[in-house]
Amino acid sequence: MSPRHRARARRSVVCAAVAAAALVTGSVAAGAYSLGRSPDAASRAVSSAPPSESPSRTPEAAEVTVDLDTVLAAAVEPVVARSGASLSVAVLDTKSGESAVYGEKTYDTASIVKVDILAALLLAAQDAGRSLTAEEKTQAAAMIRLSDNTAATALWQTIGGARGLDAANERLGLTETAGAGAWGLTQTTARDQLALLQAVFGTNSVLSEASRTYLQTLMEQISTDQDWGVSAAGSGWALKNGWMPRTATGLWDVNSIGRVSVDGRVCLVAVLSDGHATKEAGIALVEAAARKAVSSL
């Protein structure tokens, strides 16, 4: 073999080895990656290739898939484990369409249900071909911006309570949410709250553009003493939080849902949690989980 042919053969083997090493490293480091060829098989293919193999032949391209739920769990679980509380989070990148969910537990909504109540009211108004009344607008603004409970109770009655909420949610795409005798005890999941956010902030929604814009605007005007939660994960936020101590245990439910902008991306995030010793501890955990969720995508 001429010197030029020997040099060409050495380059072929080195390139193949580097490609195989990259596959092995990616598999070990990420854990959540599934490769078309196992790392061992790739290593054997390179090490067994004869030196005289033609330079034009390269290892087959490996198909790589990522389980984003697994990636999200790896990011969030250490934070939750240290807290002693229970938490579920769902996140969606609106541009790529990629989403992930951690946790399947059902939680009390507390005041995040106020977004759902207003969505149900707007849907009913659309059906009737009318705008909200002046009184309804006043109540809606107080309910979302200030988290006013009296306004929420009034609008809860207007939409028909739990039955009216459930009927609206069937149309909004929520399948894991059930209204209760008291609006704050409505049961939901992070996955379903993400579906609600898609109905509010997406374009493929039974809510009209005018209804969506109205709800979004109120969520962008949250009182400054309530602008915590998913807003910690980015800027340009619109959100609604919920917090409630449970009488039976003295422990807190702390939830946050909304939209944030991060590094040019727009994400929808829902974080639900319970079992906190204090409201402040719950807020800290919710914000940490929101940041982890957005960065995991």
Label every model-predicted segment.
Residues 2-4, 8-27, 31-51, 67-87, ...:
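Penicillin-recognizing serine hydrolase domain
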Residues 47-62, 98-102, 118-121, 145-148:
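Acidic/histidine-rich, surface-exposed loop or edge segments in extracytoplasmic proteins
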Residues 125-178:
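Conserved catalytic neighborhood of penicillin-recognizing serine enzymes
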Residues 97, 106-130, 143, 269:
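Active-site SXXK
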Residues 91, 101-118, 136, 154:
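Hydrophobic alpha-helical segments that drive targeting, anchoring, or assembly
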